[in-house]
């Protein structure tokens, strides 16, 4: 399973020092470099330097203003790449496209034209040698973008924003995870640890190199495999007999729902997305153990 790293994304509204974020537990930083074809974050250089000084991994993002215009998207991407090169952003890291409503960026055009423009931007960055990803809110990605097409081309590359509640959140509550395919990172709050910065958690290993020496891991101890229970019971939850529980497949993709007040034979046990799950059928039918009771 991929390492779950806390990641912060910073722009002109945040400090030039990453020390507080590092102290709170962040391991990676995404610095806003550019917007449109003329704006450069005046704090970017100092934020990049502080990220390195604090021995954190560095990525960068660009705020789109091209809407569904593929030609304009290429121009913005070239501007973004030029700035990334000037700041020596490693090609082992990600260049993210922030495509959302704001500053003239229109998202309500057809999903087809939106996707074409987004992919034109990503191609320029990819051709320049960088890893690429797409950021937006869960609703926009579901309604206004053909994410399946993007995932087919670039793999698991979505950075999705979806908050359980507004205000300070220190740790993600995966009961509110925006279930969709291709999610590499989840932005779960805009006020992580009360620091006034967006908080994100990785679901994919974004750092796959050894550019910086990783902390030594203790030797693995042999752990006895958990005994597989024979039957699990899914009780009525939250006092609502109509509440249903969503299953996952073995790779962590959400599947169909099952009724509560039901019994299931258990065929296996494994950790999926950090949750203990029971296999109650095929490899696409794993139920989170937290919603069940074991019946002997």
Describe the function of each predicted region.
Residues 1-11, 19-20, 151-221:
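Functionally critical loop-and-helix segments that line ligand-binding/catalytic clefts
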Residues 1-122, 126-128:
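Substrate-binding cleft of extracellular glycoside hydrolase catalytic domains
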Residues 12-14, 35, 62-64, 101, ...:
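A mature extracytoplasmic/lumenal domain signature
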Residues 37, 80, 112, 137-142, ...:
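Peptidoglycan cell-wall recognition and remodeling modules
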Residues 38, 67, 141, 167, ...:
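Flexible, glycine-rich phosphate/dinucleotide-binding loops
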Residues 91-173:
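Catalytic domains of cell-wall/extracellular-matrix polysaccharide-remodeling enzymes
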Residues 220-279, 284-296:
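Beta-loop motif signature
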């Amino acid at each position: 399973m991929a390492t779950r790293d806390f990641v912060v994304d910073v722009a002109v509204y945040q400090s030039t020092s990453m020390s507080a974020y590092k102290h709170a537990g962040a391991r990676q930083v995404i610095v806003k470099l550019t917007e449109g074809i003329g704006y450069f974050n005046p704090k970017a250089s100092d934020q990049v330097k502080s990220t390195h000084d604090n021995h954190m991994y560095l990525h960068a993002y660009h705020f789109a203003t091209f809407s569904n215009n593929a030609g304009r998207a290429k121009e913005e991407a070239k501007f973004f790449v030029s700035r990334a090169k000037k700041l020596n952003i490693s090609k082992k890291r990600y260049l993210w496209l922030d495509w959302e409503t704001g500053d003239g960026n229109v998202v309500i055009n057809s999903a087809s034209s939106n996707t074409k423009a987004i992919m034109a931007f990503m191609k320029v960055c990819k051709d320049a040698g960088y890893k690429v990803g797409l950021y937006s809110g869960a609703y926009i990605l579901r309604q206004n973008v053909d994410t399946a097409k993007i995932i087919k081309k670039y793999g698991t590359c979505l950075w999705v924003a979806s908050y359980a509640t507004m205000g300070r959140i220190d740790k993600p509550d995966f009961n509110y995870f925006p279930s969709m395919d291709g999610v590499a990172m989840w932005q779960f709050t805009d006020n992580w640890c009360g620091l006034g910065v967006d908080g994100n958690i990785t679901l994919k290993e974004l750092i796959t190199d050894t550019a910086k020496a990783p902390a030594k891991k203790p030797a693995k101890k042999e752990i006895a495999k958990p005994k597989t229970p024979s039957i699990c019971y899914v009780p009525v939850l939250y006092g609502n007999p109509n509440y249903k529980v969503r299953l996952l497949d073995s790779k962590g993709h959400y599947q169909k729902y099952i009724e509560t007040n039901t019994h299931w034979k258990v065929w296996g046990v494994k950790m999926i997305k950090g949750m203990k799950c029971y296999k109650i059928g095929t490899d696409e039918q794993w139920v989170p153990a937290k919603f069940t009771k074991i019946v002997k």
